[in-house]
């Protein structure tokens, strides 16, 4: 569902030449490059994607990342930077392409709530894809041990992680919006909306970023709270301004999915040696009713997670 760009000569900017410029954009990287920024076209979307590279530690070659479109506004860039998505001298705002986290808590199960224990969620925002490895106790008291997956336009269940697939095509529309219910997933939507993202204010002064990704058509609104009183989060000291997503709504298929985020942690308290931060209390709703109440016990950004689409999910025989 995402755009695929060939890294042609015209689209790839040599990392050495780019990073030799004075300054840059992105936290801790100095001032912006000299010269006027490129203009946003009337369409509200960047004309094409451009990429820059940086050298890996230990001489492991170059890694390329997508430079933020000139159509992506100041508020979106600042929030992306606050949670670790905005990086580098030539700013990229998609530095988090996936997450893996484990939770305890509750999740809707028929007419009741299942109790979750060490449930793992894997999300790849660039595909998009998600795997929910649900463990715990169902609302009826029976053991819960299910693996629910979607990737691209397909949905299926697994007997084991990556194995024993059975089709679950009729669940796709219920699974896709869940990927928006994390700070990173929500921000991917308003980033992809580029110049079409609308910035507004709530009555109590919070910022709301509303945009629809052209790749899935889901309207997402991210409520952002500016804070100078918080624990140390990544590189942000406790009295330093940080802009945190605290709530999200995602409208899809005639329903409204919601999420609230609290108790952010980062650095050694959540994921060692990185700047990404993540809420440890997450609550989801569906049409205003409780859907999940999650306490995060483990988190990793950009983990190695894969979502090979099985033949059965595509309606084909594996023989």
Where are these regions (language model features)?
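Gly/Pro-enriched, hydrophobic low-complexity segments
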Residues: 37, 203-315
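Bacterial N-terminal signal peptides
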Residues: 6-16
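Short amphipathic beta-strand/extended segments with alternating polar/hydrophobic composition
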Residues: 115-120, 143-152, 163-174, 221-225, ...
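Positively charged n-region of N-terminal signal peptides that target proteins for export
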Residues: 1-4
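Disordered, low-complexity segments in secreted/periplasmic proteins that are enriched in proline
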Residues: 20-38, 45, 57, 163
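Flexible, processing/modification-adjacent segments and terminal tails
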Residues: 35-38, 67-78, 151-240, 250-255, ...
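N-terminal mature ectodomain segment of secretory-pathway/periplasmic proteins
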Residues: 42-162, 192-205, 213-215
């Amino acid at each position: 569902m995402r755009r695929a760009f060939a890294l042609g000569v015209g689209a790839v900017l040599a990392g050495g030449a780019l990073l030799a410029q004075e300054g840059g954009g992105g936290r801790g990287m100095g001032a912006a490059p000299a010269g006027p920024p490129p203009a946003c076209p009337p369409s509200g979307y960047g004309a094409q994607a451009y990429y820059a590279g940086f050298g890996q530690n230990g001489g492991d070659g170059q890694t390329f990342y997508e430079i933020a479109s000139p159509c992506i506004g100041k508020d979106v860039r600042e929030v992306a930077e606050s949670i670790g998505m905005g990086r580098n001298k030539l700013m990229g705002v998609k530095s988090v392409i996936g997450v893996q986290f484990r939770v305890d808590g509750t999740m809707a199960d028929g007419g009741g709530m299942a109790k979750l224990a060490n449930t793992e969620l894997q999300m790849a925002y660039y595909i998009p894809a998600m795997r929910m490895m649900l463990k715990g106790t169902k609302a009826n008291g029976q053991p819960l041990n299910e693996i629910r997956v979607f990737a691209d336009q397909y949905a299926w269940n697994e007997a084991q992680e990556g194995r024993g697939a059975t089709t679950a095509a009729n669940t796709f529309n219920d699974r896709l919006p869940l990927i928006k219910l994390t700070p990173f997933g929500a921000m991917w939507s308003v980033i992809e909306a580029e110049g079409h993202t609308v910035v507004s204010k709530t009555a109590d002064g919070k910022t709301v970023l509303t945009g629809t990704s052209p790749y899935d058509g889901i309207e997402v609104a991210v409520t952002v709270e500016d804070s100078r009183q918080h624990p140390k989060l990544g590189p942000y000291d406790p009295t330093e301004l940080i802009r945190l997503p605290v709530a999200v709504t995602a409208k899809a298929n005639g329903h409204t999915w919601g999420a609230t985020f609290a108790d952010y942690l980062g650095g050694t308290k959540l994921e060692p040696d990185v700047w990404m931060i993540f809420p440890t209390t997450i609550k989801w709703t569906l049409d205003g009713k409780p859907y999940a109440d999650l306490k995060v016990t483990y988190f990793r950004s950009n983990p190695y997670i894969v979502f090979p689409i099985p033949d059965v999910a595509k309606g084909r025989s594996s023989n």
